[in-house]
Amino acid sequence: MPNRRQFVQAVAGAAAGVLGSRGPVFGQAQGPARRQISIAGRRVPVVDIHAHCGVAPVAPVVKGTAFEANGNVAGGQVLNAARVATMDSQGVDYQALSINGFWWYAITDRDLADRIVRAQNEGLAAWCRQHPDRFVAFASSSLQFPDLAAAQIEDGVKRLGLRGAAIGGHVNGQDLSDPRFDPFWAKAAQLGELVFMHPNGAENIIRTGALGGRGDLGNIIGNPLETTYFLSRLIFDGVFDRFPTLKVGAAHAGGYLPSYFGRTEVACDVRPNAKCANTKRPREYLRSQILADTMVFSDEGLRHLVAEMGANQIVYGTDVPFNWPLTLDIVLKASFLSEADKTAILGGNLMRLLRIR
């Protein structure tokens, strides 16, 4: 599993080469004046669901442990004025901040895991209180201890004012559809909070080293593959049936699931060994309980995503501080989207789900 040091190196690499369509990278001191987005002459908010960061209070908690390197916060993951300036230049009004949960899932010391998450959640909440008109944040949780994770997200939401939870796609190789994790899912559903999943290179399903070499395939293939597997497990193992009010957001446009959903839709009909636990058609979950960000990078990719999932299930995402092409103008220029659809995708859906006023 990549540690925080490798993550920081990747952030630094992203900052070194800016894609032309993106604008200033995170960490630059000052960007252009704030870009404001309007549709049909009406100002609309833009909310970014896919915004990586770290918080400094974690470092002293992990100092002297095997996880000390994961406590480093540097470069574009730092929460500072440069981040706000870059948001301004890119037309982003709000970021929904998240910290990768999988940095800590290998910790077996329950007390240490709890103290790390408390430091993260309190650090995120403090930043959001300082900038309530620009940031909300997903709560972190110690998913390796599902009962603790449930308590942590409740504390994050009720005491700290955080919105939902950010998780990885598995816990040390164990599928999150396993009933062991039901206390976490039950709490998220009870609270009515969105759970945002970010993958980590499909290490749970790919042979070690298989995605090495050229092309950064661990990211390019592995991340969407892990997301596809994660969502498929939630569908076919009945998680969405056990928790019918649960809503799950998936990074990287929902992985490959929407791209080849016809195969998923008929699996329980044509495969006698599928042993499906779901009680509804897979598409019903796709169009009601699953959300995906806009990171498809093309007009046709967005058209297909909306056709499969519906505009109410699509939300804007950038993957900052990594310098992927921005998709804001793809949404704005999409001839197949109504003004209402564009407004919903860019911010309306998340304003509602994350209770942004």
What are these regions (language model features)?
Residues I39-A40, A189, R242, E284, ...:
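Short, flexible hinge/linker loops that cap or flank conserved catalytic cores
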Residues D93-G238:
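Active-site gating/metal-coordination segments in enzymes
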Residues F236-G238, P244-P282:
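Aromatic-lined glycan-binding groove of carbohydrate-active enzymes
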Residues P2-P45, I49, V55-Y94, E122-Q130, ...:
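Mid-to-C-terminal alpha-helical segments outside catalytic/metal-binding sites
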Residues V73-Q77, Y105, L143-A149, N172-P179, ...:
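Acidic-and-aromatic substrate-binding clefts and catalytic sites of carbohydrate-active enzymes
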Residues P132-A137, G161-R163, P244, E284-S288, ...:
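Short, surface-exposed connector motifs at secondary-structure boundaries
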Residues V47-A51, Q95-L97, A137-A139, A165-I167, ...:
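Hydrophobic faces of well-ordered beta-strands that scaffold small-molecule active sites
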Residues R43, H52-V78, I107-T108, D114, ...:
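Active-site gating loops and adjacent loop-to-helix segments of metal-dependent hydrolytic enzymes
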